[in-house]
């Protein structure tokens, strides 16, 4: 009886050893995959994240206007006149319109306007003061309020590793992919996308990349330019076929709390078409 018990104990020990050996590679693979889902610790720094990721002397203002459905034409005419007025004062205001869009897929009856200020927040303060003392500008704002349901403003900084913003010509559509990140992960996002952006340059689709400075914080906006929705599909599929792109995505997905995309069409007065 004792010998039988000993044999069973040895057999159980051997089975455990075999089971352990047979599952080790699977566990290692699982741990390797799972490690990509963990947010890595970023070492403390005495520099602000914005200073490490961007040129703080160039600030972008993203105006989001939700327009009454029956007033889109009147609204666009009003804003076109406003842009012309500001262009006349461009030298004093140190600002210029980069692009202007209407939303085609996503938040309908919505318009986005991207302005660039050179000289930091000092120039923004100066421009606001000058415009608020301009009767024509105030009249246009008052008229525009009749066409709006709501509006929102964010001040943004451009990621330094993205290509320089260049106006596009011809017929294009744009996609704005907006992300709300977990607080404290902006540097890790930047480190990963500094590599990932190299996989998205083959079709010249990268238009602009921003993160929020004032307004909704821990917001990131990536703006892509395509010839059509079909061109978008083919360009994105080509990126997924590039070795390394999937790994970049795997590291950035855990940093995201929320994301959404909008397909945009440039307005007739947008500098970038």
Curated annotation (Swiss-Prot):
Q: Name one GO biological process term.
A: mitochondrion organization
One Gene Ontology cellular component annotation held by this UniProt entry: mitochondrial outer membrane
Q: Which PANTHER family match?
A: NIPSNAP-RELATED, PROTEIN NIPSNAP
Tell me which family the UniProt entry assigns to this protein: Belongs to the NipSnap family.
Name this polypeptide is given: Protein NipSnap
Instruction: Identify the species of origin.
Output: Drosophila melanogaster (Fruit fly)
């Amino acid at each position: 009886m004792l010998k039988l018990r000993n044999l069973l104990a040895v057999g159980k020990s051997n089975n455990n050893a075999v089971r352990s050996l047979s599952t080790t590679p699977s566990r290692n693979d699982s741990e390797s995959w799972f490690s990509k889902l963990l947010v890595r610790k970023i070492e403390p720094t005495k520099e602000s994240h914005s200073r490490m990721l961007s040129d703080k002397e160039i600030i972008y203002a993203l105006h989001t206007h939700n327009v009454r459905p029956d007033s889109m034409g009147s609204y666009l005419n009003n804003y076109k006149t406003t842009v012309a007025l500001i262009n006349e004062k461009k030298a004093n205001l140190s600002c210029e319109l980069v692009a202007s869009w209407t939303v085609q897929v996503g938040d309908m009856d919505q318009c986005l306007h991207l302005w660039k200020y050179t000289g930091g927040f000092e120039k923004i303060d100066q421009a606001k003061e000058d415009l608020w003392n301009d009767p024509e500008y105030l009249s246009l704002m008052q008229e525009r309020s009749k066409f709006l349901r709501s509006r929102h403003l964010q001040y943004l900084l451009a990621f330094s590793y993205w290509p320089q913003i260049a106006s596009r010509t011809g017929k294009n559509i744009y996609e704005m992919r907006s992300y709300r990140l977990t607080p404290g992960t902006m540097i890790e996002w930047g480190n990963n996308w500094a590599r990932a952006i190299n996989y998205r340059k083959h079709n010249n689709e990268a238009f602009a990349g921003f993160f929020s400075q004032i307004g909704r914080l821990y917001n990131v906006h990536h703006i892509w330019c395509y010839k059509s929705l079909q061109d978008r599909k083919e360009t994105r599929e080509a990126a997924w076929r590039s070795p390394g792109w999937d790994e970049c995505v795997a590291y950035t997905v855990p940093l995201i709390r929320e994301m959404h995309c909008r397909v945009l069409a440039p307005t007739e007065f947008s500098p970038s078409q």
